[in-house]
A protein has these predicted regions:
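C-terminal segment of N-terminal export signals and the immediately downstream linker at the start
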Residues: 9, 31-74
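Extended acidic/polar, glycine-enriched regions
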Residues: 108, 148-193
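An acidic, glycine-rich "communication" segment
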Residues: 347-405
Length: 405
């Protein structure tokens, strides 16, 4: 590809993203409630402006990855060094456990960065752990409904300092032997009033995570392999067509390599691919933003009402019924909603406990947010050969449809 064209394409994508984000925030409205206004150009200091005035760095970027290409056995995995966290989000003052495996066995380092704008660097260094003892931790057996749950020993227990601001945090793992790197990812949340709530789409990251092999996302089964796009296989809740997935495992590289290949995002789910650009822009503009997980939307409905606006970003496909109800209640209480992605509020899932009893760690398909009428109509079409429970209509929440009285 011509270098000049590459540069112009990058500029075009950046400008498109900025324009889309700005339009989305400007047009945000509380459907069905009394909306609160969000200043287009925030004035004065707020925690995000103060945070982004601190020195940034680009050291958060991975420089050497080794994502396995041995299809279909370990495609998209980073077996030389990989890890996961004990929670999707954590409050400042609490502790999060980070589980890491190295193969071959190697000492490793862990550097923690908060992502944001930071003068264009995209991240700020927060903490470093050196000379950590690595070990090769076992790949879990196939469990009920094809669930793969790791029970790795913690490598680090990180107490989140009280002064760490809400945000998306990356843990950069670097093996001493060979220097191979990958990420772990977690969210620091808070409960302060804010302009915007940025919801990370981590249930969808989980749905598309095929770790440990190219076979264990919601879109794989024993008979047909990847069912999402292979000859347009049916979308189904049947056990024969889809399995269960859990957070207790590393994130592999995003499995839809026909859309994007980015091995240097390995371990971050879909955050760096689809969500970080908007976070970068929001913090550049100085909006007072706080970050939450899909799991927080599921568990803490009242907490959504502390914001003027709620933003669904990235690939926000999989929701629980509790998420739908909580966001609807926030809207009715006057919180503005912005859905800045496609394929949102589509698949309905429950959140179940892990084998160890930790809440909200496992999910499976349970239905679609289509409403009864549309669900029945689509089930009769060619290719929609499976019936499944119909949740409420996602379009009603997103403003794509309205009920007539």
């Amino acid at each position: 590809m011509d270098k000049h064209f590459e540069q112009n394409s990058e500029l075009s994508r950046r400008e498109f993203l900025k324009s889309t984000a700005a339009a989305g925030l400007a047009l945000t409205a509380g459907v069905g409630g009394t909306s609160q206004s969000i200043a287009a150009a925030p004035a004065g200091d707020n925690p995000i402006r103060k945070e982004n005035a601190k020195p940034g760095t680009r050291d958060w970027l991975l420089t050497k990855t080794d994502v396995t290409k041995n299809e279909p056995v370990e495609l998209w995995r980073s077996p030389r060094i990989e890890g996961y966290c004990s929670a999707t989000s954590v409050s400042a003052g609490d502790t999060i456990k980070i589980m890491v495996s190295t193969n071959p066995v190697s000492e490793f380092s862990l550097e923690i960065f908060r992502t944001g704008y930071y003068g264009g660097d995209g991240g700020r260094f927060m903490k470093r752990f050196d000379s950590l003892k690595g070990k090769t931790q076992s790949t879990p057996p196939v469990g009920k409904r094809r669930l793969r749950e790791c029970t790795w020993e913690p490598s680090v227990e990180l107490g989140i300092p009280k002064d760490w601001l809400s945000g998306v945090y990356l843990g950069k793992l670097t093996a001493k032997k060979g220097g191979v790197q990958s990420y772990v990812i977690f969210i620091v949340r808070d409960d302060r009033p804010c302009d915007l709530l940025f919801q990370c789409s981590d249930l969808t990251w989980l749905a598309y995570n095929s770790w440990p092999t190219n076979e264990y996302s919601l879109y794989h089964n024993d008979k047909n392999g990847y069912t999402g796009y292979k000859k347009r296989k049916k979308w189904s809740t049947d056990a024969a067509d889809t399995g269960w997935v859990g957070f207790d495992r590393p994130y592999s590289q995003f499995c839809q390599d026909h859309l994007v290949k980015n091995p240097k995002s390995v371990g971050t789910g879909e955050f760096l691919l689809w969500e970080f650009p908007l976070s970068y822009w929001i913090e550049q503009q100085g909006y007072d933003v706080s970050y939450i997980s899909n799991v927080d939307t599921h568990t803490d409905g009242p907490g959504l009402k502390r914001a003027k606006g709620f933003i669904s970003v990235g690939h926000d496909e999989y929701w629980t019924r509790e998420m739908y109800d909580n966001v609807s209640a926030a809207r009715d209480a006057g919180v503005n909603l912005a859905f800045l992605s496609g394929n949102s509020v589509w698949g309905m899932v429950p959140l179940l406990p892990s084998a160890k009893g930790q809440f909200h760690r496992v999910m499976h398909r349970a239905g679609k947010f289509l409403g009864e009428e549309l669900s029945k109509m689509l089930s009769k079409r060619k290719g929609w050969t499976s019936t499944f429970p119909a949740g409420p209509d996602g379009a009603l929440l997103m403003g794509g449809a309205h009920r007539r009285n």
